[in-house]
From Swiss-Prot:
Cofactor(s) this protein requires: Ca(2+)
The name this protein goes by in its record: Basic phospholipase A2 CTs-G6
GO molecular function: metal ion binding; phospholipase A2 activity; toxin activity
Task of the protein: Snake venom phospholipase A2 (PLA2) that induces local edema a few hours after injection (5-10 ug) in the hind paw. PLA2 catalyzes the calcium-dependent hydrolysis of the 2-acyl groups in 3-sn-phosphoglycerides.
Species, as recorded: Trimeresurus stejnegeri
Keyword Transmembrane in record: no
Organism phylogeny: Eukaryota, Metazoa, Chordata, Craniata, Vertebrata
Post-translational modification remark: Contains 7 disulfide bonds.
Length: 23
């Protein structure tokens, strides 16, 4: 789900997950 995806993105990029979604 989006929550798990967001956590993965945060761990991989070290950025705020919201920025990866363009939010």
């Amino acid at each position: 789900n989006l929550v798990q995806l967001g956590k993965m993105i945060f761990q991989e990029t070290g950025k705020n997950p919201a920025t990866s979604y363009g939010l």
